A protein has these predicted regions:
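N-terminal hydrophobic/helix-forming segments and targeting peptides
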Residues: 1-354
């Protein structure tokens, strides 16, 4: 039950790129009593960061990003509608008529709806670009919007409450990309606390900011931690609703996804083989993917410190970068278990041979 509640809390938290504080507070409350936790000016959060000169063993960085896709107020119109820009990648077809929350200048959120044209007034194909949409917060003038505390630069997040569907063992909610990764790191760091002395590696957990707008936080966090090895935890888009069982590489309930390549990184082949061997040893279900598009913080991390062996492990997410998605608790638990087993199996000689 604790696991389910943690995932729900993280999914519900408001945290577009640059405004990740609510997410970080949840994680700090979960873990700050057992680890040293620190935050930098980029809003990256570090759990158990160990200075290089104090390390006795190779350091493995577990990394996820804390931000979610959303929007930001660009201007307030005379009639009180809010002009906005996207923060992160959105398809205009998945945005209209959805509920959102807008952060006011006193730290509260007020509800709104992204504008749409009723079917009665549609002309042509009815398609509308993001640049032509507005957020309606139920006011009728510029002054009313200002009185509500709306400002240029106010962040906007999807207004969605996460649910756990126990019969299907699925979560339905927003921002699983990448609150799922945040939850895994939180759980792993808790679970290994009493076993750290028996591991042959040091472990630091990192929640990086601003991934959705250009992998920015990870540039700073990987330079600060300077790890010997990195495991990036992600919630990549599932493809099992539109690909057959032979071509699908991101199916729900098919296990942890191991990524070979995407446009930002080719995974270290020896590291990938090691991961697959460990998964087989412990009978952990996994699937493999070769991605033609997308990218993760691994794209920046693997280039730091004269090259860091890095891999991306994912929990596939249906309908990523939209208001609502599904993730499987089974896949989450496969990923969690694999990360813990990797930490158990890794040692200095293995890492040197990657």
């Amino acid at each position: 039950m604790e696991r389910i509640e943690l995932i729900k809390k993280l999914s519900n938290a408001e945290g577009i790129s640059g405004f990740e504080d609510n997410v970080l507070e949840i994680i700090k409350n979960e873990i700050s009593d057992i680890y040293n936790v620190e935050k930098d000016s980029m809003n990256n959060l570090y759990i158990n960061n160990i200075l290089k000169e104090n390390r006795k063993k190779p350091l493995v960085m577990l990394e996820a990003h804390s931000d979610e896709v959303g929007f930001m107020v660009q201007s307030i119109e005379a009639n009180g509608l809010l002009k906005f820009i996207p923060i992160g990648g959105w398809s205009s077809s998945q945005v209209q008529a959805h509920k959102v929350k807008v952060l006011t200048n006193d730290g509260k959120y007020i509800k709104g709806i992204i504008s749409s044209t009723p079917v009665h007034f549609l002309k042509g194909d009815g398609k509308m670009e993001l640049k032509d949409m507005f957020v309606d917060i139920g006011v009728f003038s510029y002054d009313e919007a200002k009185e509500k505390g709306i400002e240029v630069g106010s962040p906007i997040v999807p207004d969605v409450e996460c649910e756990f569907l126990s019969e299907q063992n699925l979560f339905l909610g927003k921002a699983f990309d990448d609150r799922i990764g945040c939850a895994i790191i939180t759980e792993v760091m808790k679970d290994i606390k009493n076993d750290l002395d028996n591991l042959e590696v040091e472990v630091t957990g990192v929640l990086s900011s601003q991934e959705e707008v250009g992998l920015r936080g990870a540039i700073v966090s990987s330079q600060k931690v300077c790890p010997d090895l990195a495991i990036v935890l992600e919630a990549p888009p599932a493809d099992d609703t539109f690909r057959n069982k032979f071509s699908s590489q991101g199916g729900l309930k098919k296990g942890v996804q191991i990524r070979h390549i995407d446009p930002t990184m080719i995974a270290n082949p020896k590291f990938v083989k090691f991961i697959k061997d460990v998964a087989k040893k412990y009978n952990i279900k996994y699937q493999e993917t070769v991605r033609e598009s997308g990218g993760t913080n691994a794209g920046k991390i693997h280039l730091e410190n004269l090259g860091i062996p890095t891999v991306v492990l994912g929990v596939p997410t249906r309908y990523a970068h939209s208001h609502h998605g599904f993730v499987s608790l089974d896949d989450y638990e496969s990923t969690l278990e694999l990360v813990k087993k990797l930490l158990k199996e890794l040692n200095e000689n293995i890492i040197k041979n990657f």
